[in-house]
Amino acid sequence: MNPVPAQREYFLDSIRAWLMLLGIPFHISLIYSSHTWHVNSAEPSLWLTLFNDFIHSFRMQVFFVISGYFSYMLFLRYPLKKWWKVRVERVGIPMLTAIPLLTLPQFIMLQYVKGKAESWPGLSLYDKYNTLAWELISHLWFLLVLVVMTTLCVWIFKRIRNNLENSDKTNKKFSMVKLSVIFLCLGIGYAVIRRTIFIVYPPILSNGMFNFIVMQTLFYLPFFILGALAFIFPHLKALFTTPSRGCTFAAALAFVAYLLNQRYGSGDAWMYETESVITMVLGLWMVNVVFSFGHRLLNFQSARVTYFVNASLFIYLVHHPLTLFFGAYITPHITSNWLGFLCGLIFVVGIAIILYEIHLRIPLLKFLFSGKPVVKRENDKAPAR
């Protein structure tokens, strides 16, 4: 087995937590954006729409790179079956917990907010199933994708490790140009697959489980594997943690292209295929921007940072129904979009932290929302003297 570095990657922990917590301003700004969501303000805000688009354009690509990095690190630490079990428990248990406790109540609330409760009995069995798939998975989709990726990587990581044993990894060289070409080709390949499905059988693209399990996994798997390779090859990791003006400039241009596609593209034409190509390369370049920024400013340990690193998943899980509640019942009473956005942040973050502190004091909830069994310390077991 390859040795696992003893030094903790504090900046990667921090970046992962910040990317998770960015989901809060992302969804609150979605209320005030020009994008149609479950709940929207009376008038959209141009700047909050731009802010929302910026977060959406790169956040999950970078997140899956970090997930792949830590996943391969644990792959080297545990036997294969235990690695799969630990990884699936860490993401699967919180997902299964959040469905009845968070997204089901959220779905029921939205049925009444949007006036759809009366029409529910009239839906076909498939429409009910598909609606529940979209609404109950909801913002938990990335956890489902991680379960699928972990299962696929039982084979992929084994192949990578076997290939490394038969080759000299010190001779592997990477360049951002080469990676950009590879990810451009991957983006085009994904676009071709999506367009082919759209031509052959379009209804499957509106199927919630197919979207999450197949399409989302297919798009984000290259970033997950890229993270694993960054753990294996120090040169590749250094390529991402070293600031690059070229990547910053390219990412800025790609974001402009993303905005233009959002504004002028058509869903009936090539909008989604174009977006997949843009966000594939944009995500790669933003890995460099985010990693280099985080490596310079976040590579340290502190109690406050550790608190939010540990709390980030729970806060993310509970923020979504809180955001929708705020949008449905409080947003209509605030005339200013920016004031509403700030009030939403205070409302959602404040309640989420309170709920986090409460759940820490209930062992069952602490286990269910983390997937980690409660381990008693040896000192707790020792008899009093």
From Swiss-Prot:
Entry GO CC: plasma membrane
Protein name, UniProt field: Glucans biosynthesis protein C
Gene name of the encoded protein: mdoC
Keyword NADP tagged: no
TM region(s), chain numbering: 17-37, 60-80, 91-111, 137-157, 173-193, 212-232, 239-259, 274-294, 311-331, 338-358
Role description: Necessary for the succinyl substitution of periplasmic glucans. Could catalyze the transfer of succinyl residues from the cytoplasmic side of the membrane to the nascent glucan backbones on the periplasmic side of the membrane.
Family listed: Belongs to the acyltransferase 3 family. OpgC subfamily.
Membrane topology, from the record: Multi-pass membrane protein
